């Protein structure tokens, strides 16, 4: 889930190389709606998005679906206050915005251990 078309297409390429299907939403509200319909195994969620930010969307999804595995993927995810809020809202991992296949596979492994 990312409002940037560049990062959505880049994410799709990496996720598909890992063997997963890729769906996207460009804002947090659509992310919540899409999660409710599709129930994906994993979600990569940007923090800074329009309408509903990724932290709010993460909290809404994890409140409704406690087993949701959300990986925050944001250029501000390394900032302590955002990391703390992401985990408090139910995220189970943080990825750098410029993640690669190895980063994704490691984050998925860690998410599987948490939830």
Language-model regions: role of each:
Residues 49:
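Receiver (REC) domain active-site loop signature in two-component systems and cognate sites
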Residues 99-109:
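C-terminal output helix
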Residues 27-30, 53-57:
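Acidic catalytic/metal-coordinating carboxylates
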Residues 73-74:
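Hydrophobic/aromatic residues positioned on beta-strands within the core alpha/beta folds
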Residues 56, 77-95, 106:
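Alpha4 helix (beta4-alpha4-beta5 surface) of REC/receiver domains from two-component response regulators
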Residues 46:
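Active-site residues of response regulator receiver
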Residues 24-42:
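Acidic, metal-coordinating helix/loop segments flanking the phosphotransfer/catalytic sites
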Residues 5-23, 89:
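Two-component/phosphorelay signaling modules centered on CheY-like receiver
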């Amino acid at each position: 889930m990312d409002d940037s078309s560049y990062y959505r297409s880049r994410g799709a390429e990496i996720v598909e190389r890992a063997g997963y299907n890729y769906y996207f939403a460009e804002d947090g509200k659509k992310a919540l709606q899409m999660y409710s319909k599709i129930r994906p195994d994993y979600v990569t969620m940007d923090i800074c998005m329009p309408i509903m930010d990724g932290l709010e969307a993460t909290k809404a999804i994890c409140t409704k679906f406690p087993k949701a595995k959300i990986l925050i993927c944001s250029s501000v995810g390394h900032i302590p206050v955002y990391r703390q809020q992401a985990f408090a809202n139910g995220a189970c991992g943080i990825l750098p915005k410029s993640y690669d296949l190895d980063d994704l596979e490691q984050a998925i492994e860690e998410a599987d251990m948490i939830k």
